A protein has these predicted regions:
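Short, small-residue-enriched loops and turns at beta-alpha junctions
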Residues: 5-10, 40, 61-63, 70-71, ...
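Alpha-helix-loop-beta-strand connector modules within alpha/beta enzyme cores
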Residues: 9-35, 71-93, 129-153
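Hydrophobic, well-structured mid-protein blocks that either form specific transmembrane helices
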Residues: 53-112
Length: 180
């Protein structure tokens, strides 16, 4: 997974192309590009046609992602970029807050998967709020599965908190882990 940002602090455009070529030579390896589809991400998706594109609604000013897609407000715009990516043969995942009622909206705009934004789970682990937060994630994963979506998860995950999340959210297909 790479997250090319307009400020190029994580990866440069040439790196995206080079990494795509490298991974295509390794059968069975997937290439996921994540970022804001309304900035520069779609140019990369068109150029390299990754296995998966994860649409994250971050802004230029953000140091890191801090919220999921607001499909109630921006659903029509996401529907267009999802359709474009899928027409290129790219699986699409939408970065989503753990709100079970919004999982069907991701399916309605054409997404194949959602990625649960797990920062709130990681932040509450070991506190009195942890059980309720874990339940919210489990319900969101269940709702996504019932809507016919694959489920990814990521943000502030580590070996210290991953197992508990995977046990509670049995439908998770893929995780992005920050540290071991």
């Amino acid at each position: 997974t790479v997250h090319p940002r307009p400020d190029e602090r994580h990866i440069r455009p040439d790196d995206v192309t080079a990494l795509s070529r490298l991974l295509k030579a390794w059968l069975g390896r997937e290439f996921n590009i994540e970022g804001n589809p309304f900035m520069n991400l779609m140019e990369h998706v068109r150029n390299v046609r990754p296995d998966q594109a994860t649409f994250v609604p971050d802004s230029l000013a953000q140091k890191t992602s801090d919220h999921g897609c607001d499909l109630k407000k921006d659903g029509a715009a996401f529907e267009k970029v999802v359709a474009e990516a899928k027409a290129l043969g790219v699986r699409v995942s939408l970065f989503m807050d753990p709100e079970p009622e919004n999982m069907k909206l991701a399916k309605d705009v054409g997404a194949d998967r959602i990625e649960l934004y797990t920062e709130s789970y990681a932040a509450t682990r070991g506190t009195g709020a942890a059980a309720a937060e874990l339940t919210r994630f489990a319900e969101s994963a269940q709702a996504a599965h019932e809507a016919g979506l694959g489920v990814n998860a990521g943000h502030d995950l580590s070996l210290a908190n991953l197992e508990e999340l995977l046990v509670a959210c049995r439908y998770i297909d893929e995780v992005s882990i920050l540290s071991l």
